[in-house]
Amino acid sequence: MLVLNRDKKRVILNFSVLLRALKTNSTTSFTFIAKNITSESAVAQVQLFAKTDILIAAHGAGITNAMYMLPGSHIVEIFPPFWYFGCYRKLVDNLRLSYSKVISHGERGPECKTDPKSMKCLIDGTRDRNFYVDVTAVKHALKEGYSLVWKNKFGVSVQ
């Protein structure tokens, strides 16, 4: 299992809480890796994603590396509040991966107070905001992901 960490935009503000919850509640034999891939070479990223069964990541370009994951793998995409553009879902479907989404809750940024329909609000005040994730929702999506990976990738039914 790979959990992507971001350090500029769409930072999960309670990332350490999320990691602790995932590590302490993980009852599977999946290896657990938390990583920021921005400084990794392209080759290192391909190698990392090729051996990833489950990816947990905030909405962003890092999810395009799913193209290197094997069919039957699973993606948990975490959306910032008010951002629902599911372009990576289409990619995941085409790659024969399974998918869960977690929509975070919160407020729009101050960029949206003056003109809520502006591009500044859409990008800076919505898509690129740092946010808190609902840890319970991620754990639920991960539980679903475990079952799907075991079934679709390894042909094993688990409950």
Residue ranges and their predicted role:
Residues 1-159:
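The feature primarily captures lumenal catalytic ectodomains
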